[in-house]
Design a protein with these regions (language model features):
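N-terminal secretory signal peptides
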Residues: 1-4
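ATP-dependent adenylation/pyrophosphate-handling site
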Residues: 37-44, 48-82
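Hydrophobic anchor at the start of a short beta-strand
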Residues: 65, 104, 168
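A conserved beta-strand->alpha-helix junction
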Residues: 70, 97-112
């Protein structure tokens, strides 16, 4: 498929998703095939809290959604061993993915001990390559949590090495405390999927869902909605530069 055809295909497939900076294609008819959407998060609950409503919109529009969890959140439950916590949090992640109509994949790193090396760059590249994504979401790399940084940088390195570039977008979590220096380029109106996102986040019972929202996510959704001109929104930063993919003329 030539670059022009790819651009048109993705534009048509984006009908109804609602990115502020992408053209509206509400009049588009059929699409050649569903998009393949992948989200890479450091722990169970990161993709859900960062861009769960956007993932839900993609799934509702008929696109295939996969969530790759870098770890199983092994260090995330005080008083539980790594294996015990991993079992609990994996079950929570699977329940959240079921709500979002997403396929869960657990990459195999360990919460709190994540690494970036050639072996793991290759593993992430292979994971993403097997999914053949059109669009990938991951953490913004400037983050106070090392695991978030690792998930982001492994994804970025995979994108750099990809023979066929996918669109790469970064999401925010607990802005100002974890995600730092985040200046959105794109927004998604999540008014219709905000409640589904909340239900997915609340699947992570072990992580104190009210605390997740108290960390700033309620305010983030409201503030990003104010910026977009809607009741609620999720915000993203788009990868740009020489190596950017050829999907959109923005």
């Amino acid at each position: 498929m030539n670059p022009s055809s790819r651009r048109q295909f993705v534009k048509e497939a984006m009908t109804g998703i609602g990115f502020l900076t992408l053209p509206s294609f509400s009049g588009a008819s059929t699409i050649a095939r569903p998009l393949k959407i992948v989200c890479v998060g450091a722990h169970p609950d990161d993709p859900e809290s960062g861009c769960g409503a956007t993932l839900a919109k993609f799934a509702a529009a008929g696109h295939a959604v996969t969530i790759i969890y870098l770890t199983r959140g092994e260090a995330g439950i005080p008083g539980k061993s790594n294996d015990e916590a991993a079992a609990i949090r994996s079950k929570e992640a699977i329940a959240a993915c079921s709500l979002l109509k997403a396929k869960p994949i657990f990459a195999g790193q360990v919460d709190g001990d994540t690494v970036i090396n050639n072996e793991w760059v290759k593993k992430m590249q292979d994971l993403l390559g097997s999914e053949k994504p059109d669009i990938v979401f991951t953490h913004w790399p400037i983050d106070s949590h090392k695991d978030h940084q690792c998930a982001s940088l492994l994804t970025i390195q995979s994108w750099i090495r990809a023979s066929i570039k996918f669109e790469l977008y970064f999401f925010e979590v607990c802005a100002g405390e974890q995600t730092l220096g985040f200046k959105p380029t794109d927004y998604v109106d999540i008014t219709d999927t905000q409640e589904l996102k909340r239900k997915a986040v609340y699947c992570h019972v072990s992580q104190d869902p009210p605390g997740i929202y108290a960390c700033g996510h309620t305010a983030m959704e409201q503030f990003r909605g104010l910026e977009m001109g809607t009741a609620a929104a999720e915000a993203f930063m788009r990868m740009t530069g020489k190596k950017k993919g050829n999907y959109f003329d923005l």
